[in-house]
Amino acid sequence: MKSSATVVLLVAAVTAAMVMSSSASGDAVMIDEHNNIMTSVEGKRGIGSSVVANGGNRKMANVLLSGWENKCAGHGESCLGIGISGCCKGYYCSWPSGSICLCVPKGDPCGAMHTCCDGLSCTGFFSGDCV
């Protein structure tokens, strides 16, 4: 009984920390309806929700990740929290140096993880230059 309460508190603490860090950037909404805590991040990121439900003597915690909105982060937009695959085609996430989506301009080195800007191509798969 103590361990399930500890798990619920741990999940609630992690969720609260995620919501606070997300709220600081102004892109999240937290809704508390009768102790059911839901977090929603709109726009270019997915929607996550955490629900703490009271089921008799036990509390059950479910962390759900809803479907992605099929949107991506474009040039100069933050990719923090959405990972390298969250940038639009033709862009890569500069994580951890700046955590924004970028593309490689003409004449600069490129490769599989550093894609050229629209209209340009890389002379090599792993290593080359944008032309």
Swiss-Prot record:
GO molecular function annotation: sodium channel regulator activity; toxin activity
Chief site of localization: secreted
Transmembrane segments: none
Disulphides: C72-C88, C79-C93, C87-C101, C103-C117, C110-C122, C116-C130
Signal sequence, renumbered to the chain: 1-24
Keyword Disulfide bond: yes
Record-level GO BP terms: defense response
Propeptide residues per the UniProt entry: 25-69
Keywords: Disulfide bond, Ion channel impairing toxin, Knottin, Neurotoxin, Plant defense, Secreted, Signal, Toxin, Voltage-gated sodium channel impairing toxin
Tissue: Expressed in trichomes, that are stiff epidermal hairs located on the surface of petioles and leaves.
Gene Ontology terms: cellular component: extracellular region
Domain of life: Eukaryota
Localization of this protein: Secreted
Its biological purpose: Plant defense neurotoxin that causes pain and systemic symptoms in mammals via modulation of voltage-gated sodium channels (Nav). Potent modulator of human Nav1.5/SCN5A (EC(50)=55 nM), Nav1.6/SCN8A (EC(50)=0.86 nM), and Nav1.7/SCN9A (EC(50)=208 nM), where it shifts the activation threshold to more negative potentials and delays fast inactivation. Also shifts the voltage-dependence of steady-state fast inactivation of Nav1.6/SCN8A, but not that of Nav1.5/SCN5A or Nav1.7/SCN9A. On Nav1.7/SCN9A, principally acts by binding to extracellular loops of domain IV (Nav site 3).
Free-text domain note: The presence of 'disulfide through disulfide knots' structurally defines this protein as a knottin. This toxin contains 2 'disulfide through disulfide knots'.
Family: Belongs to the urticatoxin-2 family.
Protein name: Beta/delta-urticatoxin-Dm2a
Species name: Dendrocnide moroides
Phylogenetic lineage: Eukaryota, Viridiplantae, Streptophyta, Embryophyta, Tracheophyta
